[in-house]
Amino acid sequence: MAEPVDLIFYNRVMDRITIKQIMNGLMTHFGITYATHVLDQPKTLGFQQATRGATSLGIDDLLTTPSKGWLIKDAEHHGNLSGKHYNYGNLYAVEKLRQLIETWYTTSEYLKRGMNLNFGITDPSNPVHMMSFSGARGSTSQIHQLVGMRGLMSDPQGQIIDLPIQSNFREGLSLTEYIISCYGARKGVVDTAVRTSDAGYLTRRLVEVVQRIVVRKSDCGTTSGISMNHSWKKKRIIYQRLIGRVLAENVYINNRCLAMRNQDIGNLTVDKFIGLTAEPIRVRSPSTCKSMLWICQLCYGWSLTNGDLVEVGEAVGIIAGQSIGEPGTQLTLRTFHTGGVFTGDIAEHVRTPSDGVIEFDGRFVYPTRTRHGHPAWICHTSLFLSIRGRNKRHNLLIPAKSLLLIRNNQYVESEQVIAEIRTKASPPKERIHKYIYSDLDGEMSWITGVCHTSEYMHSCIHPTLRTCHVWILSGKSDNKKDKLPVSFYDNQDRINSNTFLAEDQSFPSTPRNKNRSNICIFNPYVSKKNRVFTRWELTHIAFNSSNQSVNSNIILYDYDVVRKHRTFFLREMYTNLYFLLEVKNNGVLRNNDFFAITDHPKYELKESGVLKYGTIKIGSADRNNESRDERMKKFRSTFRIVKGGNFFLIPERRYISAQVLSSILERNNKSVRVGTSITSIVQSDTSGLVRIGRRINNTYEVKILPGIIYYPDEPNKLSERVSVLIPPGKQLFNKFRCDHWIYFQWIIPLEEKPFALPRPATEYVISNRSTQKKFLNLLRNIDLGINTANYLLHADGEQIRVISGRCTPLIRTCLIICWGKKYFTEKAHVSLLKIKTTNNSRNYLQISLIYFDSLDEKRQGDMVYSQYILRRNYYDDFFSICRNRLKSKHKGIIRISSDRKDEYRSSIILSPPDLIEVSKMIGSKNPIGKDTDNFSSTEFFNFQNQLEKIGSIRNRIRSRAKHFLRIVSFDEICFLGNLRTSTKLDECFYWIIYTGAKTCLRIDQSRQTFQNPKWFLIDEYIGIYRCRCEKNINHNLFDYYLPSPSREGTKIPSLGHFLFKDFRMVETKQFLPPGQVIGIHMDYLIIRLGKPHLANEGAIIHNNCGGSVEEGDTLITLIYERLKSGDIIQGLPKVEQLLEARSTNSVSIDLGSSFRDWSNDMKRFIGNLWGFFLSARISMEQGQMILVDQIQKVYKSQGVQISNKHIEIIVRQMTSRFLTSEDGIIDISSPGELIEFSQARRMNRVLEEVISYEPILLGITEASLSTRSFISEASFQETTRVLARAALKGRIDWLRGLKENVIVGEIIPAGTGSEEVIWQRTLEREEDIFLSNREFCFGENIENPFWHSDTFFVFPTMETVRNILRESASANGRNI
């Protein structure tokens, strides 16, 4: 025994793998008995320490990964980008789903890796961490769901739910996440109950197919083997694959033999291989054993129980079946915890080693599209790629069929992904149909890419010929499903609501529309019939016994009212302008009154200077339309812009010095540079000419005029010129050329020579359309609009002083309301409308215009009492039927499809909500700041009484930037009715207020109303709520944006052009909504709103071009292939699919492709005969290895280690049958018959004409039913059929396997004492004695395909030939 001082002490954690290595080392060096005695001691120690430690799992042990927060945010950011590209029409719905799956699966995998790293750093002895690597009931996947994220789930149909579960069980799931998680949990519970029996049945089938495999020989003499392609970066995998194997050939290093053939590989041998060689190592395998019915000792290798060569006579087949089937039962118990969770593989990427420019030959690549919709290039063959950096060049080789994600000559950064490598084995795929549904009513349209002719008559199914966009253009269809002919109107006719459209042939169904509310008005004095008005009209009539007055309320839904502190602004969606509301006189506007102002941010000054007018024209005030506001009259009468043009600012820098002139360090008319000291404390921040002047308060002011001093050659002629503005491109003194506008100023000092000072000038351009009109109600017969008037705030030649840190506006824009007097009276009422829903509320401006219809002049001054109730209700009828005619519910323009020739044509009504008007003017951005001071008035816009309070605030507000407005919908407006009101006719207008159930509401009230009205709100549950009345804060919501001068070269979309979302016109800042241009005006565009859908090649369109579409209709069916998604319940269905070799399995596909590839390669080198033979043999070997790797991959994903040799025994039995072809001898076997490979080899050795056969891959069930023993087949399944066929054929069971001997009660042919084993050993000893007396050479590695004899020294006698033929004939006769 060694001295204690010489003992080696290892202070490290012993995990399961390390303990297994110690056990193997002990058994190798000391034997099983000593190793058992040593291992009893750590076992006892382990139980003692586990009892003392009492390791248990608590909720505090569940530690969340710190990196989860930013990983989730990054994934959500990528999801938002995918959603934007999908809305733009750049992605298919399938590509969007793929991006989402790839993003969240990658996030989940990174989170899982971070979880293991976090446990290993912070708390390695954490019970949760130890459980994940214990190999018992827990694994990394289960722990990841406890502390990481549950991830994507699969529904019962196997479809992936596109809403990932971001939470884990430690944090708790939300309601939505819990419902989604129940899909997988329910699937897990079902699998726990059902898959347990499947696991047991799988074990039975595995044992059934290999039960006769017994070790009978020491060496079969084969020279074949399999190659172990190893990567020394994963030493653990190399140890598991090589230890216990036997070498198939010698291993050489530099002509030195490192290991001999038939030498078993132990730990020391593997260490030599890892340190000295990197070549693939060929080892013997059960799948390449030459034994016909059994297996040899060297092809199997070590026994896993004692670390030595397996004993002859051991039933390794049953051991292999049990070792593969038994883990399936254990894995089934994990189903409940992880059921339904989606798993996949991250694609293998190529990253750049350093920064540089990519260079490759572009002739070998062609453009394509990735599965996520990104542009890429695919290479035909292996592509040589070079990265040219600053100091060195890196060369990379990209495999064939890989996707390049970068362009040629593109600059890349270090570790950037440049290529995606295609997997060698094609993964299993399935064909999926994804349906795209419409989310709005309208009309379907497409241009190219779709087959317009259907395959069948009267069919609306159209396939796509290539990738194209399918548009859904917004519109309202009263003629649902094209059931009625449009007989009264033609295309482009304008109609009003309640207009008869067509004759009714039958009473159509009344579809429900949950979002449509109607208003019923009752008048008990005139008529008992209810009159229904939809809120699309927004025009309501109050009936009484003597007259009728119509009150038209215009709600500016393109704008909303934004409140900043105490000030209200108008905000528009498609231009970045805010307008300050300026409404006076109790909220009453007269014709041509202004109601909102803003200062254009483009025309703001940040530096002092002199203003010079250019081509711009200024007019005087319009005396006929003078405003009643003195403030408005003051600046309107002097500087109103009549015609657009340009004006200029000549900048200058001003400094105010002390009262003493001597304190100024520079003299007058002297040129200074930047940094020159003007006074002792002031330095010049610009270069130019110094001008000193005296102010009124006896202080001296210093101005720096930027420019260059030039002394001309002829000062007399120059003095005749006055100061002028010189445009770009003009020459000065025939020496200089101007690059920009300059202000040429002449300076004449008192005592010095006169000189010229060219000063830079800043040009401002304003559009010629200084006054424009926008009609508020498109497609309505109302001559109502707003004018935009621009005003200059400074006169020509005025010096503008800008205080540091502030901006001075140059132009102010006013919005002026105007209408035709033939329709309305002289007044319009403005009120604030607040529309409140459950989770949101918005403010709008409402303008009430009062006009009269057949009103007697004598009764206009009388009091009119009208009693009516407005009730909110929901109607199911989408259109009204009157006298068998279809009545329109909408007001707009008829759009009739021209794709159908019959009388039943699709019709769409374009209403105001379906269209949008976009100005061609150029917008700009300058949103209001957070520090804006606001104001409001509790009075009815009586600003005259509040000027003293808010004067200073308003001055600051007017110096702010302009603001933008946002388009909103008026679909959520609710109405109230007045039970008893008493008003003057000339001031009569109805009331609309914002609503909120069971709350006190603020009601707008006009001061000219004689009696406060009583308001009642009726909600959707017919509940009546009384609301109190208060004074109204009346605001004007007339929405418009401030125009700016247009630029030359602006590209306007053509008529009929389709615009995608956020389409930006050239050189403008306007982003247009998606839709189609249906009208082009000189000042604006009319766009019909729509939504694009991208359809790939082969997709199916479910409607005709121009056909009407309802919300929820199926539009497109996308057909695509996707990888089969698995879950981590236990991998049992995947293993069963592989072992049964179903047609959906990728192994059969790989065998066929491998055979073709090897056949073509071999024919070029060897010839046809050898090429077919070797390609069939090698393709079968490759198929066997692929199948072994796929089965091993499923079990490794669950942390289960299975020896490859056991899987190879199963795969050998699956590939041991061959299918006879028609070229065979008919007397021996019929075409299509399954025969064993050993039987075919024996027949070909003795027959003159060989049998032609093809390799085939059988499942374990079919392989079990095609053995030589009918007793074994009958005991497995289909007993009656198997026994009946065996009796008819006269088959004889030779009892070669273990199962049939157990059934008949005989001794099983296994074990060291078996007679067959003893006879086989005796025969081997005789062969060894004979071979020792003769020289023998094994020949080359590639054996002769025509040499089928296993023994070379004895020629078969005639009796042996007859026995073999008799046995073969009898076996074939039984199979017929």
Curated annotation (Swiss-Prot):
It comes from the Eukaryota. Zn(2+) binds at C220, C289, C296, C299. Its EC number is 2.7.7.6. It is found in: Plastid. The keyword rRNA-binding does not apply. Pfam families: RNA_pol_Rpb1_4, RNA_pol_Rpb1_5. InterPro entries: DNA-dir_RpoC2_beta_pp, RNA_pol_beta''_euk, RNA_pol_Rpb1_3_sf, RNA_pol_Rpb1_4, RNA_pol_Rpb1_5, Rpb1_funnel_sf. Its main location: plastid. It is an enzyme of class 2 (transferase). Belongs to the RNA polymerase beta' chain family. RpoC2 subfamily. In plastids the minimal PEP RNA polymerase catalytic core is composed of four subunits: alpha, beta, beta', and beta''. When a (nuclear-encoded) sigma factor is associated with the core the holoenzyme is formed, which can initiate transcription. This is DNA-directed RNA polymerase subunit beta''. It comes from Aneura mirabilis.
